[in-house]
Amino acid sequence: MRQFIVQNEQAGKDSTRVITLFNRIMEQEPDEAQLPLLYAQYLLSKGMNKEAGPVLRQVLTIDPTNTAARMTLLGEAVRQEDYKEIMNLCEAGVESNPDMLEFYFYLAIAYNQAERTDDALAICQKALSHVKDDSKKEVVSDFYAIIGDAYHTKNLHAEAYAAYDSALVYNPSNIGALNNYAYYLSVERRDLDKAEEMSYKTVKAEPNNSTYLDTYAWILFVKGNY
């Protein structure tokens, strides 16, 4: 099939012949994922993302552990901000590929968007149980940052600050964690020097970010430096 695609491309012919042949193959309901995945990749190469979606889902029906298909569908769901679809893909993803931290991460974000705080907290804690020595520190940091946000939503401030501290151990430049940690400290009127230092780092990193500028200005106001 690959050779047929190459020959078709080299001959300068349109994609109709290739797609027709693939559709005939798909009608036979193949029990291996290789050909459907090749078909999906071909459709994507032609910019036919919408048509590729059902084919990729068929790949997952045949082989739920196929990360290429799931990640491609997930990428499209993220671009569309389709949080329900993100949940569907990632809930299945953490079961079929429990060591893929990306599925936990996007699932936690989707749960947050749905205001399912306890679920976001639980999935992040589950993700941390799968962290290995070679896991990306930035990703681990993000999980702790989400945990911090979740604990703060539940008014568990001490637990939130401990989670933010862990986030910054793994990635001292985690801008989101720095900003939220600084802001929440300032609201409580505690550790204001620490809050100012953290907030300053966010402004230095992204000087045109209005959210970080507002946090920094607020902390200075609370400290009386205005």
Pin down the residues of each PLM region.
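Residue-level recognition of tetratricopeptide repeat
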Residues: 41, 75, 109, 149, ...
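Structural motif corresponding to the intra-repeat A-B loop/turn of tetratricopeptide repeats
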Residues: 11-12, 46, 80, 114, ...
